[in-house]
């Protein structure tokens, strides 16, 4: 028992000493990323014993690579240069456009986050740093920033899903002024991709900032945004429910033996019932939209097909969609949805599915829009698609 006590105390003291070292300013403190006046950026990391230090980020040139059998674009790795006192640096070749960017280091072959940058996001099990190049109104850098505009509120609430046998968590954005009025609002259901959760669109997706800024600039109507957890075996994000601190995975299950009692589309009425009974929402297809990225695009397709009288606006972003899904859509298109958007990056490893699906929609004579952009399976594209979609809603 004494050995355990002293081991724990040693760990505590060591951790406390490290924290005090940072508080007292005796650790190496660097400005990284260092955004210059011309919007070029310098990255720095202290690695005095390293042999090689490299950097990758979505602001760097991309090259074609094989990703688990799918051909896609990925950013290159660049070498950082060692300077004095063991500090390695890299400066971009020129200014970066206003946008939200992510990056990471590789020190002697091992991935590292930037210890000088506290802003990080998790994509399944991978953590990367991010930074924002701000810009003029209307630019991505402006739309993803926290500007001096009226702000909505975000709450994470729990609702009962008898279909899944779980008490589940959902993130809900209410627009500016919601608390001070009796007005009712239309609803957008916004779905994440595989490996994500109810936090994803709020973290690197910047959904609340996008909605605040779009509403403030008149580009979008005030609306409630519902961001569910799309993993039928999970109640909430890893570590935020009673399954404990488990590792995130593509399936979203806390362990491989976990089986879902139903699918997310089958359980959707549980969520809609909660939203419509706890929030001031305008009901009906003309006041209800749904969109999602990747797996969430598949959930959007399946859910809107399963409940064709519920949705008037549908958006599939790099969606997990397939040509044979088209056979399920006749009841939905008989209701004449106002918007049916299919969006994807031309370098996305699953772009062919979106292209083929759009061709099948056209062959059936189903009214729809397509949005093909540069880039791959990335948040840069999905944030843009959300803005394009949100601007068309409820008008």
Q: Can you name each region flagged by the protein language model?
A:
Residues 1-21:
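Bacterial Sec-dependent N-terminal signal peptides
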Residues 8-9, 14-15, 26, 33, ...:
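Low-complexity, intrinsically disordered/propeptide-like segments
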Residues 35-77, 81-395:
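Non-catalytic cap/lid and distal C-terminal segments of serine-dependent acyl enzymes
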